[in-house]
Regions:
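An acidic intrinsically disordered interaction segment
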Residues: 18-25, 122-144
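Short, leucine-enriched amphipathic alpha-helices that occur as contiguous helical runs
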Residues: 29, 50-55, 138-142, 161-165, ...
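Short amphipathic alpha-helical segments and their helix-coil junctions
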Residues: 32-44, 142-155
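Basic, Lys/Arg- and aromatic-enriched nucleic-acid-binding interface segment
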Residues: 34-65
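Basic, alpha-helical nucleic-acid-contacting "clamp/cap" segments
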Residues: 86-131
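Short, basic (Lys/Arg/His-rich) helix/loop patches that form interaction surfaces
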Residues: 144-210, 214-219
């Protein structure tokens, strides 16, 4: 219910945009969804389900999956009432879950060339597949995402790294609000919270600085 209300309440004005570099961070999943939908609307594409692939890639990035995990993500982990993320069922806002289910069940998409043609996906157990490949590599995945990002000239920074980091910071902030033992000065604790090795003092300091910027933007 909380996810649904977040999704319903987000407006374009909520997006924090730096004019020189686009969106630096996303506050929540609703904000990310809004940016993706805005981008797809300007595409004037004959079949908007063409963009289900990059959209799902970015939603999985938000939930903390690595690029390798995303390209190997199995269709069977998309359930009718949620998505299995790292072995746990995760509830999704209705609109986003519909995109996951649509991609899971899709046989391909329509494209307007000389007339309308149907591009069939190669059969695969993987959720992320194309008309040529039952499994794609990370470079191809980045290309799919970039196709979506360029629709609005990168204004929304729809890139894996931006969204992956935003999701981590969002969950870190939830934890900080709920926990009395939240101490980012401890490198081991910070490494667990930010899902990376922060034993290096330089990296540790930089990540805390980034997290503080995220909080200044949104809270």
């Amino acid at each position: 219910a909380e996810q649904e209300s977040i999704l319903a309440s987000v407006t374009v004005d909520d997006l924090k945009i730096n004019e020189t570099s686009g969106v630096q961070y996303y506050k929540n999943l609703g904000m990310l969804h809004q940016a993706i939908q805005d981008s797809i609307k300007v595409s004037e594409c004959y079949d908007e389900t063409l963009f289900d692939l990059p959209a799902v890639i970015l939603y999985l990035a938000w939930f903390g999956l690595t690029e390798e995990q995303i390209i190997n993500f199995p269709k069977e982990d998309v359930l009718d009432d949620g998505v299995m993320i790292n072995g746990e069922k995760t509830e999704m806002p209705f609109e986003i879950l519909q995109i996951f289910k649509r991609l899971r069940d899709a046989e391909g998409y329509y494209q307007q060339a000389r007339g309308v043609i149907f591009r069939a996906y190669v059969y695969s157990d993987n959720l992320i597949r194309t008309e040529r490949n039952s499994k794609i590599n990370v470079s191809k995945m980045q290309g799919l995402v970039n196709r979506l990002n360029t629709l609005m000239d990168g204004t929304y920074s729809l890139r894996y790294n931006v969204i992956h980091q935003s999701g981590i910071f969002y969950r870190a902030h939830l934890l900080e609000c709920e926990s009395t033992q939240f101490n980012l000065e401890d490198p081991e604790f910070a490494s667990k919270v930010f899902c990376e090795d922060l034993s290096s003092k330089v990296k540790h300091t930089a990540r805390i600085r980034d997290y503080k910027l995220y909080k200044q933007l949104f809270y």
